[in-house]
């Protein structure tokens, strides 16, 4: 079973991880049948497909791709009343926009919280996932990737959690990272972060907020469902690495 796609070299990821990385582009108009010899030029080749695309999944499996992780993308409508999020924040807590001085503590938290992701062994080295997300949250605070980072804090100023947000268009925003600080679990901080993101969207006249998470992250799946978000799509991430036996 053949697979048609373009092989797009991922320069930034190649440099960051020190691994020659490519990603298959199935939407390319000039897509050609992929040969195993072409894939051998890269340490890692990534593919993201719709979870319902069984034919393409079978074709990728024959090329030596392995399932890495499933992904669920949610969409939350902003214009409707939302009692769950409207009552999420307490008067003893506040929401601030993260500033550069807070980057070190946020990097440390992100490196710890996001240690398990699709950037995992055996394709990536231990610590690579944490390094990636630490840089992500730094860029979110600086506004060079996501556009802002909101912090839920105690009245004392201690950070309880963070959520980064990106403008997609006039009507739509997307959550990049959402995490509770280590040691602050079990206090409903995830709900408070979703409340902060929801308020931010209302303030910026957004009509929809998108957020994706791993299928294995049951806590996040439950949080987004309780927040009123609906499943918009599901997908699989697959990798082919030079370590794989084909």
Map each language-model feature to its residues:
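A conserved beta-strand-loop-helix scaffold within acyl/acetyltransferase catalytic domains
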Residues: 117-135, 139-155, 159-173, 178-180
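Short amphipathic alpha-helix that is part of the acyltransferase structural core
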Residues: 19-26, 87-127
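Acyl-donor-binding surface of acyltransferase catalytic domains
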Residues: 26-101, 235-240
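A conserved beta-turn-beta hairpin within the catalytic core of GNAT-like acetyltransferases
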Residues: 8-25, 68-71, 147, 167-176, ...
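Conserved GNAT acetyl-CoA-binding A-motif
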Residues: 40-51, 201-213
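A short, internal acetyl-CoA/4′-phosphopantetheine-binding micro-motif in the GNAT/acyltransferase core
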Residues: 19-30, 50, 178-186, 213-214
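Conserved active-site alpha-helix within GNAT-family acetyltransferase domains
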Residues: 52-67, 187, 191, 203, ...
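Conserved acetyl-CoA-binding loop-helix of GNAT-fold acetyltransferases
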Residues: 29-38, 177-182, 186-203, 222-226
């Amino acid at each position: 079973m053949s697979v048609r796609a373009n092989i797009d070299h991922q320069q930034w990821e190649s440099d960051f991880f020190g691994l020659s990385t490519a990603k298959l582009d199935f939407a390319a108009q000039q897509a050609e049948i992929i040969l195993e010899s072409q894939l051998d030029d890269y340490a890692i080749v990534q593919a993201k497909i719709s979870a319902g695309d069984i034919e393409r999944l079978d074709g990728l499996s024959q090329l030596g791709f392995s399932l890495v992780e499933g992904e669920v993308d949610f969409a939350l409508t902003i214009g409707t009343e939302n009692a769950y999020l409207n009552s999420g924040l307490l008067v003893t807590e506040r929401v601030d926009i993260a500033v550069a001085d807070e980057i070190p503590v946020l990097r440390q938290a992100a490196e710890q919280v996001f240690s398990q992701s699709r950037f995992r062994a055996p394709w990536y080295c231990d610590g690579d996932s944490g390094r990636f997300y630490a840089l992500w949250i730094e860029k979110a605070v600086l506004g060079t990737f996501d556009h802002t980072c909101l912090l839920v804090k105690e009245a004392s100023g201690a950070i309880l959690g963070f959520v980064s947000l990106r403008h997609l268009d006039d009507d739509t925003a997307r959550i990049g990272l959402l995490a509770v600080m280590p040691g602050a679990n079990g206090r409903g901080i995830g709900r408070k972060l979703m409340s902060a993101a929801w308020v931010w969207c209302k303030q910026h006249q957004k009509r929809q907020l998108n957020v994706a998470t791993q299928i294995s992250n049951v806590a996040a799946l439950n949080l987004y469902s309780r927040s009123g978000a609906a499943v918009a799509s599901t997908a699989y991430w697959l990798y082919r690495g030079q370590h794989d036996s084909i």
